[in-house]
Amino acid sequence: MPIVRDAARWIFLAALIYAPWAYGGTTSASIQMINWLLLAAFILWVIELLISGRRPALPRLLLFLTCALVGIGGWMALNAKSIYDSDFYAFVPLWNLAPQLAGSVDYATSAAWMTRGALLLCGILFVVDLSQSNRWLLRLWYTIGLVAGSIAFLGLLQKATGARMIFWQEAPPWGATTFFATYYYHGNAGAYLNLVWPLTAGLAVRAFTTSSHPGMRALWMSMFILTLAAVAANTSRMAQLIALLLFIALCVKLGPTLLRNLSRIEKNIAIAGAIAILLTLVALGQATHLEQPLNRWQTVSERIPNDARWRASRVAISALPDVGFFGFGPGTFRVVFPSYNSVSINHVPGTWRFLHEDYLQTALEWGWVGSGLWGLLFFGGMVIAIRSYKKPWAQHWRPRRRLLQFFAIVALVGVALHALIDFPLQIASIQLYVATYLGLCWGGAAWQRSEVRGRGKEHGGQSSEDSRE
């Protein structure tokens, strides 16, 4: 049933729009809404598969990893040994199914986290199936690009007007200095922007290398400039450093190829365009108070050695001998960390919801087996995508597929680097976008068949999803 299939996909695109605008998915209300949208999309997708009898091309390894992670996390929540009482800072013992086996130290937190985690894993499978359609692949790309531009524009507007808080919220008495666009923490905003600006760059490249309408070229070039300028205006130094590295890598990879395909006149136009873009970025920088992030770089040598995140990481490392195969339970870092912090020689003040090191936090919550499976899902997806991209039959992919997968890999490399000293992979909106990109990466292994079917339909007149569209 095309109507059910399309409804599921439109709802998923709605989740991609909603997540970054709803404070990046950092409030309980926004997380619940994201969960409901993903659940609705997944249910409609399953209904469509059952009615049509269609069998999606899902990689077996991805299915195994999804089932294994849902199984481990679900068991840890089901067999929880206690629940954390935040009023008295104590763990209240619970009756559990198998006391001798592993279980979470906080039932409520792990159950809530696994609800979101299971839906995100299903989201990866959903995108694998969606990516087989050329039309929906482009719709997905357009959605990400437009949302990216809107978030970037809001952040730049805040900087230009000297906003003391997100426009529709009241600024606290002590002032707020770490917000950007709809994100309360500039590090998360920077991680999100580094996830999306490579895809806006891809849309700009696609617009200028195909017979696109001049309006589309202007639109996607504007989105690219906005998102890149937003990274520069944001005060997250790590985000700026990663953006610079990614931009250099893209120039080295794509620059020579693009120049070879241009005539002498087109090269001169491209150089003039590059100068115009540079001047535009400079003008945006002046209008959006670019001196603020530049001033933060001047104090980097003083701040980094004394940053509390390094001591927090040492406290977390001291807990590693106790994690076992399956860890303390999904999402339990915030309740486990205080116990180790209070007795550590590296004691750090304050309340820590997340560790500024995603990989170490994952090891604490999921143990050696669980974190290994997450690593295989994330980095394995990137490896699968790179291998698919280099296969001989990948040369027959449509240009949109080759471009989108390449830029998705670049974006995932960026968030993987950011996760070394921050917590982007704990934020719901970033998790959703990473799951989407991983779906594109894992789905690339089946693109050969979908492209072959597409060409067969064009020449043989057979009906299919793309022909109906």
Where are the regions a protein language model picked out?
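Transmembrane signal-anchor hairpin modules in multi-pass inner-membrane enzymes, especially those
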Residues: M1-L146, G202-M221, I248-I277, E302-I304, ...
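Juxtamembrane membrane-water interface segments that cap and precede transmembrane helices
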Residues: A19-W21, G25, P93-Y107, Q169-Y184, ...
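Membrane helix-loop boundary segments at the extracytoplasmic
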Residues: P20-T26, A232-T235, Y359, A363-W366, ...
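Hydrophobic transmembrane alpha-helices of multi-pass, membrane-embedded glycosylation machinery
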Residues: N35-I43, W197-T200, Q240-K253, F378-G381, ...
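Membrane-interfacial helix-loop-helix modules of multi-pass inner-membrane proteins that assemble, modify
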Residues: A77-S104, L140, S150-A191, I225, ...
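A membrane-periplasm/extracellular boundary helix in multi-pass inner-membrane enzymes
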Residues: N79, F153-G162, E170, L228-T235, ...
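TM-adjacent membrane-interface loops and short helices in multi-pass inner/ER membrane proteins
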Residues: Y185, W310-W352, Y359, W366-L373
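Hydrophobic transmembrane alpha-helices and their immediate junctions
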Residues: W368-F406
